């Protein structure tokens, strides 16, 4: 504003800007105050106007709401009146329906009474009818007597006819009355049904009307509800509008206030922009320095975090390996115990086998009978079988235990892998999060820098303004001095942190070295344990082979025993066959006697049966003839009765008379029926007579058979043909029996051979399965080891890179290009560790007796001592020796390296005719040593 005003006045730049005097300054202040008051009053005026407008709109809305509520109130009143009216109508209808129901109930009661009366009347009439029928149904004998008398007394019959006609007339009259009453009842029922249908139709119409009314009522209620909802929505919107208006007024006021503040700040900014330009150069220089320091700090922080992560991983691996080691040691101790127990049992079994063999020899030497030998052999076999079963059971238990342990080991390894993968995943996620955190920190730092630069720029502008005004601030100088002091302090702090970090890095290097060392030791222990496990597996294989040999010996013994048993069986069978022949002949004799007695009893019973049947048939014939005579007499009686009935049962007056031909036909039909019955009875009699003749014939046949059977039991003479045939058949039977026994023996022998072959096949299969399982286990173990080595390779590369970087840094810090004392110490320790590893390998290899002898000869030839297994004391001594070597290295730097004595070992090749066990043992012990190896000492 000032510059524009001066340009309008054509003020030159060389001259100073005119400044107002004291009075003008006071006037300017007053003017500014008045302007502020004016602006405030204008703002208040605007607020009041807006409030008035909002109040007027609110009043309009309130009036509208009032009108809506009044109309709603009226609608509700009309609805209440209509509901009361409907309620009164419903009450009236209810009263009317109750009256109608009472009337209907009364009518129903009257109808029930009438119905009961009618039923009583019907029951009485039916009783009377039944009595009349009973009177009519006279007894046949009385009727016959009455007919005989009626022949003499026609007058009595006429009177009877009259009475019967009277009774018939009465019955007809009663039936007519009944029909009339039923007709009336049906008409009344029809009237009742029609009235019911009318009432139902009226009720349905009423229900429809009520439904329509309910629908209309519901629609009306819905309309009122919609009305209420709209009113509520309008009220809500009015409230929202009021709130919005208030908020708008408040926002406008705030906007005005902010506009004033912004104007003031713009003025202040214009003044400060000029001051900021001067300090930008200094800030850029300081920023460069700070950015360099930050970059160094971030690099050191990254290195520190990386080293910390590696330390954590190494610690976890150490803990895991130590726990695995303990578990393996426990398992190995258990397996050793089991193996020791098994060896003891094997020795016992061998001793037992020797005792059994001795007994066998003793038994064979003695001249005992075949049966005694067989019993002894059976006892011995039983004892041997028991022992073998026990051994098999124990072996099975041991195998199960071993299998379980192997499975547990595999499960633990799988768990370990899963945990390692989880840890790696969490580490990667942690690294990712750390990176994100670093990024965020960097961004916040950038924002702080920007803020700082802005503040600095504002301060520069303020200073420029003060300089333009001609004011010099001592506070600025003090602030700058304070900032310089702060920066110096921060520099000192950074230096101290740098020194701390360097010391920590050194410590970490030392820790890393010790961890590597311990890791190497753990690996050695692991390898030794694996070798021991392989040796145990070999021992188990050997024991299994010995067991298979024992089984083969046992099978041979069993075969010999079976042969002896066969001989005994043959002798017994010969004995039994002779005894059986004698017994069979005696039994046959007894059986024939029993059969004779049974046959005689059967014949007696059969005779008695036939006689009883004949009696029954004669009785039936007599009964039939008596029935026939009775029926003839009945026919005569029926004829007489028929003649009487024809006279009595004359048709009444008004009915047609039945002709004589009708009765003749009826009589002929009855005669035919009787004739048929007579024919059927004759046929039955003829049939019974034929059966009697047939039974007599069968009796004769049975008698002839019995006589033949008696003759067959007579003694046969040696000169007869039957005797010769008997002898021939017996010889054929004997030859057939011998053939059958031979075949049975052959079948048994074949079955035994098959069984033995199956047993051997099962044993071989079992051995093959075991071998396959072991092979798979070994393959999985090898695969796991390969995997572990592959996993460790990137870590090793990373560590080597880190070591190289750290070496370079240390050399830079020490300002040397040659190897430092620390590096030389590390190399020395590595060489010592390498020597220890070779010693340990040699010790592990020398556990085998053959290899130990070879090593001993070669070492004695070269005048060297054999390496021994080291304990914890040797480790401590090695550490002390490494320290002493480190000290000695300080003095000796340019000496020549010591000469190494080389031993060339040549192992003798195994002969070709060696068994599998020796091969497996040699392969297990020499798994880590080649045929030719050079050892530097």
Swiss-Prot record:
Pfam families (UniProt xref): CCDC39
Cystine residue pairs: none
Modified residues annotated as Phosphoserine in this record: 888, 896
Gene encoding the protein: Ccdc39
Protein name: Coiled-coil domain-containing protein 39
Coiled coil feature spans: 16-137, 165-339, 365-615, 664-816
Compositional bias segments (type: Low complexity): 873-887, 915-928
Species: Mus musculus
Primary localization: cytoplasm
Domain of life, source organism: Eukaryota
Record carries keyword Membrane: no
Any one of the GO BP annotations: regulation of cilium beat frequency
Chain segments carrying region Disordered: 866-937
Function text: Required for assembly of dynein regulatory complex (DRC) and inner dynein arm (IDA) complexes, which are responsible for ciliary beat regulation, thereby playing a central role in motility in cilia and flagella. Probably acts together with CCDC40 to form a molecular ruler that determines the 96 nanometer (nm) repeat length and arrangements of components in cilia and flagella. Not required for outer dynein arm complexes assembly.
Compartmental location: Cytoplasm, Cytoskeleton, Cilium axoneme
Family classification: Belongs to the CCDC39 family.
Tissue expression remark: Strongly expressed in tissues rich in ciliated cells. Expressed in olfactory and vomeronasal sensory neurons and the respiratory epithelium. Expressed in node cells carrying motile cilia, in upper and lower airways, and in ependymal and choroid plexus cells.
Recorded GO CC terms: 9+2 motile cilium; axoneme; cytosol; extracellular region; glial cell projection
UniProt key word Phosphoprotein: yes
SUPFAM superfamilies assigned to the protein according to its UniProt record, in alphabetical order: Tropomyosin
Keyword terms, alphabetized: Cell projection, Cilium, Coiled coil, Cytoplasm, Cytoskeleton, Phosphoprotein
């Amino acid at each position: 504003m000032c510059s524009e005003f001066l340009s309008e006045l054509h003020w030159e730049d060389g001259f100073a800007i005119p400044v107002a005097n004291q009075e003008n300054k006071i006037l300017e202040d007053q003017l500014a105050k008045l302007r502020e008051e004016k602006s405030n009053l204008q703002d208040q005026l605007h607020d009041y106007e807006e409030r008035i407008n909002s109040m007027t709109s609110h009043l309009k809305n309130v009036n509208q709401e009032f009108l809506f509520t009044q109309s709603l109130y009226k609608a509700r009143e009309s609805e209440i009146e209509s509901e009361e009216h409907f309620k009164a109508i419903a009450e009236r209808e209810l009263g009317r329906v109750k009256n109608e129901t009472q009337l209907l109930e009364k009518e129903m009661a009257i109808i029930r009474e009438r119905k009961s009366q009618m039923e009583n009347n019907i029951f009485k009439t039916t009783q009377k009818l039944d009595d009349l029928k009973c009177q009519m149904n006279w007894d046949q004998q009385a009727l016959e007597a009455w007919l005989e008398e009626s022949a003499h007394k026609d007058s009595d019959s006429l009177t009877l006819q009259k009475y019967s006609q009277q009774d018939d007339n009465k019955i007809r009259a009663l039936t007519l009355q009944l029909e009339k009453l039923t007709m009336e009842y049906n008409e009344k029922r029809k009237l009742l049904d029609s009235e019911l249908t009318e009432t139902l139709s009226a009720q349905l119409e009423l229900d429809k009307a009520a439904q329509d009314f309910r629908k209309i009522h519901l629609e009306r209620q819905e309309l009122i509800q919609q009305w209420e909802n709209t009113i509520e929505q309008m009220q809500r919107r009015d409230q929202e509008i009021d709130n919005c208006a208030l908020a708008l007024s408040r926002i406008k006021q705030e906007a005005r206030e902010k506009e004033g503040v912004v104007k003031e700040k713009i003025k202040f900014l214009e003044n400060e922009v000029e001051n900021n330009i001067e300090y930008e150069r200094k800030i850029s220089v300081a920023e460069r320095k700070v950015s360099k320091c930050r970059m160094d700090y971030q690099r050191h922080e990254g290195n520190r975090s990386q080293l910390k992560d590696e330390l954590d991983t190494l610690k976890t691996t150490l803990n895991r390996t130590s726990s695995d080691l303990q578990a393996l040691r426990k398992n190995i101790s258990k397996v050793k115990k089991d193996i020791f127990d098994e060896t003891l049992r094997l020795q016992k079994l061998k001793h037992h086998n020797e005792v059994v063999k001795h007994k066998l020899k003793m038994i064979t030497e003695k001249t005992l009978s075949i049966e005694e030998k067989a019993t002894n052999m059976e006892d011995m076999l039983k004892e041997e079988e028991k022992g073998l079963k026990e051994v098999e059971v124990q072996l099975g238990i041991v195998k199960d235990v071993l299998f379980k342990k192997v499975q547990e080991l595999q499960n633990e390894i799988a768990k370990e892998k899963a945990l390692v993968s989880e840890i790696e995943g969490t580490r990667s996620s942690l690294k990712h999060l750390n990176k994100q955190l670093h990024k965020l920190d960097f961004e916040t730092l950038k924002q702080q820098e920007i803020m700082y630069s802005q503040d600095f720029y504002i301060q520069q502008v303020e200073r420029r303004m003060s300089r333009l005004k001609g004011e010099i601030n001592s506070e600025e100088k003090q602030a700058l001095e304070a900032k310089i002091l702060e920066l110096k302090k921060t520099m000192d702090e950074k230096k101290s942190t740098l020194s701390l970090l360097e010391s920590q890095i050194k410590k970490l290097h030392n820790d890393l070295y010790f961890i590597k060392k311990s890791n190497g030791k753990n690996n050695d222990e692991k390898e030794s344990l694996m070798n021991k496990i392989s040796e145990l597996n070999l021992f188990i294989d050997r024991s299994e082979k010995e067991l298979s040999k024992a089984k083969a010996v046992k099978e041979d013994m069993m075969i010999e025993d079976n042969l002896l048993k066969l001989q005994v069986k043959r002798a017994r069978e010969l004995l039994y066959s002779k005894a059986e022949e004698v017994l069979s002949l005696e039994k046959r004799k007894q059986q024939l006697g029993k059969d004779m007695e049974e046959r005689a009893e059967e014949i007696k019973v059969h005779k008695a049966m036939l006689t009883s049947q004949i009696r029954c048939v004669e009785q039936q014939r007599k009964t039939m003839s008596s029935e026939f005579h009775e029926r003839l007499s009945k026919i005569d009686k029926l004829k007489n009765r028929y003649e009487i009935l024809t006279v009595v049962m004359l048709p009444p007056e008004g009915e047609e008379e039945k002709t004589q031909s009708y009765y003749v036909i009826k009589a002929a039909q009855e005669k035919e029926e009787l004739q048929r019955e007579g024919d059927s009875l004759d046929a039955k009699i003829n049939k019974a007579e034929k059966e009697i003749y047939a039974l007599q014939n069968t009796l004769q046949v049975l008698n002839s058979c019995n006589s033949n059977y008696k003759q067959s039991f007579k003694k046969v003479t040696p000169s007869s043909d039957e005797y010769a045939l008997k002898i021939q058949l017996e010889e054929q039977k004997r030859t057939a029996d011998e053939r059958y026994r031979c075949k049975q023996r052959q079948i048994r022998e074949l079955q035994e051979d098959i069984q033995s072959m199956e047993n051997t096949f099962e044993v071989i299969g079992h051995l093959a399965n075991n071998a396959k399982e072991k092979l798979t286990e070994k393959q999985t173990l090898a695969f796991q080891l390969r995997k572990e080595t592959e996993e460790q390779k990137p870590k090793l590369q990373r560590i080597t890179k880190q070591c190289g970087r750290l070496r370079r840094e240390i050399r830079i810090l020490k300002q040397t290009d040659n190897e430092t004392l620390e590096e030389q110490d590390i190399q020395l320790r590595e060489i010592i560790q390498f020597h220890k590893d070779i010693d340990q390998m040699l010790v592990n290899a020398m556990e085998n007796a053959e290899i130990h002898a070879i090593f001993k000869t070669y070492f004695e030839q070269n005048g060297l001592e054999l390496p021994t297994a080291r304990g914890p004391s040797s480790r401590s001594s090695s550490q002390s020796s490494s320290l002493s070597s480190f000290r000695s290295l300080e003095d000796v730097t340019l000496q020549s390296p010591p000469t190494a004595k080389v031993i060339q070992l040549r192992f003798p090749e195994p002969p070709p005719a060696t068994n599998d066990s020796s091969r497996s043992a040699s392969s297990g012990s020499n798994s880590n040593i080649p045929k030719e190896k050079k050892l530097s000492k």
